[in-house]
Amino acid sequence: MNDTGNKNRAVESERGPFYLSQLRGAQSIVFTKAPYLLSAASVAGSKEAQGPLGKCFDLTNEDDLFGAETWEEAESNMQKEACVLALGKSHVDPKSVRYLFGGDLLRQGIATSMGVEDLQIPIFGLYGACSTSGEALALAAMSVAAGYGDYMLAVTSSHFGSAEKEFRFPLGYANQRPLSAHWTVTASGAFLVGSHLNKIHSDKQRQRKSQFRHIRITGVTIGKIVDFGLKDSQNMGACMAPAATDTIYRNFQDLGRTQEDYDQIITGDLGYIGQSILFDLMKSRGYDIRKKHMDCGMTIFDQETQDTHAGGSGCGCAASTLASYILPKIENGEWKKILFVPTGALMSTVSFNEGASVPGIAHAIMIEHC
């Protein structure tokens, strides 16, 4: 046996065949025992409430400050509400949750740290820009599948006011926006991932149907950073589309699949410009995904009436759309299998001011009706 064979046998002996059996290709995992997505909750702002998904959100507020004094505190309040709602739907006490995976767009992840501190759940703070919901869900599902705990919580958020202050201009400045710019979504999405379905203890719980009973995360494809050298932070769709292409293509290659194996391939916030680039890049690799594609940033707002230019963006865009609109369709069997691919533009105010390019990242989550 050659050195590679000896090495593989040593790894299998150390980690066990169970570990190796879940790996697929270069970047993917298919879970031997797929975790359940038990519940999800969405909290959104006033503009989102006026959009096409307004009636789908669990909680909306006409006051985008959510009773707070600052945009940052408002975003934290959204995260807290989303987590409490998600846990409440599944009747799970925060003390039963092993780990929380969360993040946002702000420096040092302050929206998350201030938002979830009262829950007192051990936390991994994440940053994947607008792909954070995918990163959090992937890690939560991997942790449950590995046996590290029965319950994991994933949460993320964004806020138009806090993002404008952080990355662009204070709202009072009233700067003009190019048509390629996105509108940061004011929303939060939280998801409870578990190893088993909880028992329904009463007719009231059964009637509410608040807990999902037919959704599993069957696998993930973890993305790589892809940088095409673009520097225009007001055209994030173009910056993120190459990363989305790379991850979707890798999912197809790792698993021997095509777009026909999914009811929907759903990106996070490529918007109208990014979607067009994604179609071209995927076609150059031999795949036509046009009839299967949906983008959360194009879904959450009405482009004609809400003047959001290229579409919605932000961590809360993909997260709240998944929680409010996509998962119910999987639960009722309308969609049997989707590939959820949140996308992120990895930039900061420092990198932008120094003239650095804007790399992209995308993670793919395979979610199925069961």
Predicted ranges, named:
Residues 2-72, 170-249, 254, 291-307, ...:
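Condensing-enzyme catalytic core mediating Claisen C-C bond formation in acyl metabolism
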Residues 38, 101-103, 152-158, 193, ...:
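Short beta-strand segments
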Residues 75-91, 137-139, 239-254, 321-326:
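Short, well-ordered amphipathic alpha-helical segments that serve as non-catalytic structural scaffolds
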Residues 150-184:
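Flexible, glycine-rich active-site loops centered on histidine and acidic residues
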